[in-house]
A protein has these predicted regions:
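Conserved SAM-binding loop
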Residues: 61-62
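S-adenosyl-L-methionine
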Residues: 1-18
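Conserved class I S-adenosyl-L-methionine
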Residues: 20-32, 49
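Conserved SAM-binding loop of SAM-dependent methyltransferases across substrates and taxa
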Residues: 32-46
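S-adenosylmethionine
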Residues: 53-55, 67-194
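Mixed-charge (Asp/Glu-Lys/Arg
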Residues: 58
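A general structural motif
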Residues: 20-22, 45, 95-96, 164
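Helix-rich interaction surfaces within compact, conserved domain-sized segments
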Residues: 200-205
Length: 205
């Protein structure tokens, strides 16, 4: 949670002072925990919309909203097509001040399993026979991995430039930043920033 809060703090710094209304945030791949809408609502009083492809995650997320009075205005939209990120989620003439996204890290389940095994070995000195993932399949892997997801998001964002003031995304691997920037520039953005975040032994951009 601290790392996610740091991300939203940096994102909040990008927003111009908004008067007379709540800022609107779109969370891509919000997951069952709704962590970004939870933080966005509690810490910044944002109006939040989350997108998700997994039906079970959506059901659980809607349950969280019903149990939390401060989040009753939060909306969850299902992405019907896994090949899309933004189409079908951002409605015509709809405006968002901010988009946030924590993309899938891995290309497939095998890559995720291997990374999890390395992590356990580094932490415990041996490989564990069980696998404990901190997220669902949709949150952890995407065909082509993080780099492919970033390319897709960059290209799709160009189609919604008049509807979203700031597109933001965490990038876990430094080597992907250059690729991401190259594809973002194809859409002729008004501004482009790379902000380094460090929490513990982890670094993100």
């Amino acid at each position: 949670v601290p790392g996610r809060f740091d991300y939203l703090l940096h994102a909040n710094d990008l927003l111009s002072k908004i008067e007379g209304r709540r800022a609107r945030m779109l969370d891509i791949g919000t997951g069952a925990s709704l962590i970004y809408p939870l933080i966005g609502t509690a810490a910044f009083n944002w109006e939040c919309v989350g997108s998700e492809v997994d039906k079970e995650a959506i059901s659980y997320a809607k349950g969280l909203i019903r149990m939390n009075a401060s989040m009753l205005g939060t909306k969850i939209r299902r992405q019907e097509f896994k090949s899309n990120i933004l189409p079908g989620i951002i409605e015509k003439k709809e405006q968002f001040d901010l988009l946030v996204c924590n993309p899938p890290f891995y290309k497939n389940k095998s890559e995720a399993l291997a990374a999890n095994a390395r992590k356990n070995k580094n932490l415990h000195g041996k490989e564990q026979t069980h696998h404990n993932f901190g997220g669902s399949a949709n949150e952890l892997w995407y065909k082509g991995g993080e780099e492919a997801f970033l390319k897709k998001l960059a290209l799709e964002s160009a189609e919604y430039g008049s509807q979203v003031h700031w597109f933001t995304c965490l990038v876990s691997k430094k080597e992907h930043v250059r690729t991401f920037k190259r594809f973002i520039r194809k859409g002729n953005p008004t501004d482009l920033k790379v902000i380094e975040m460090t929490h513990g032994n982890k670094s993100s951009q």
